């Protein structure tokens, strides 16, 4: 907030029942989500600025792994339960790092049933900005959700250079788009894709960290392309 943002996101990205159970943690995801809401509200109140709070609808399981998404009923129960906590406590819902059309449809349906303002952010398949981790085309995904009243469609948690390319696809199918990338760029000199077993490995092993000025160049390009929302994701910092 001190650095100038006008939206912050609740920090409950990994507070999901499947992730906590997989880590052997005894914490309750709903209790952790309540804490995340309270911390976001305190941050906004302490700065006395006009800053919105986005309630996070995170992936229910490990990021970039749509193959680990459970049944539709489990997704519905998860998003419905955190929706109840967000009502009257956040300004909008952000369905983020969405890896498949199935996940997007369920998360957005629950969000739209309970909130007026809903944003949805896709992520891409490793180094291929044209695909979701599910191997579905990003263009098909954007077109599918364009039929709803989602306010903005975004791309997040991908290399800054690939994110810039991905929003060109968003631009073809919606006027309201944006991005919040990682502070990294794709490094083609790293091992070939065949050496990695999962999309998650591809995502993190083909990266070179970039500094603030280099990140700014990518954000500026996104704005020039027409992005109406820009920000930062993995490893970005206030500066």
Locate predicted features:
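Domain-level signal for soluble alpha/beta catalytic cores
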Residues: 1-239
């Amino acid at each position: 907030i001190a650095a100038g943002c006008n939206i912050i996101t609740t920090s409950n990205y990994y507070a999901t029942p499947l992730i906590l159970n997989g880590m052997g943690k005894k914490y309750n995801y709903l209790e952790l989500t309540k804490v995340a809401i309270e911390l976001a509200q305190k941050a906004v109140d302490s700065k006395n600025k006009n800053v919105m709070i986005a309630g996070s609808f995170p992936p229910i399981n490990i990021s970039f792994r749509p193959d680990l998404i459970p049944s539709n009923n489990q997704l519905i129960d998860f998003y419905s339960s955190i929706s109840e906590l967000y009502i009257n406590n956040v300004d909008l819902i952000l369905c983020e790092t969405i890896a498949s059309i199935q996940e997007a449809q369920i998360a957005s349906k629950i969000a739209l049933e309970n909130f007026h303002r809903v944003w949805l952010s896709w992520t891409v398949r490793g180094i291929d900005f044209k695909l979701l981790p599910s191997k579905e085309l990003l263009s098909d995904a954007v077109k599918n959700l364009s039929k709803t009243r989602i306010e903005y469609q975004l791309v997040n948690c991908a290399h800054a250079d690939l994110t810039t390319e991905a929003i060109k696809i968003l631009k073809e199918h919606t006027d309201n788009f944006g991005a919040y990338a990682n502070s990294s760029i794709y490094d083609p000199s790293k091992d070939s894709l065949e050496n990695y077993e999962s999309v998650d490995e591809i995502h993190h092993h083909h990266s070179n960290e970039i500094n603030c000025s280099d990140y700014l160049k990518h954000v500026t390009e996104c704005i020039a392309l027409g992005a109406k929302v820009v920000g930062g994701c993995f490893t970005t910092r206030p500066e």
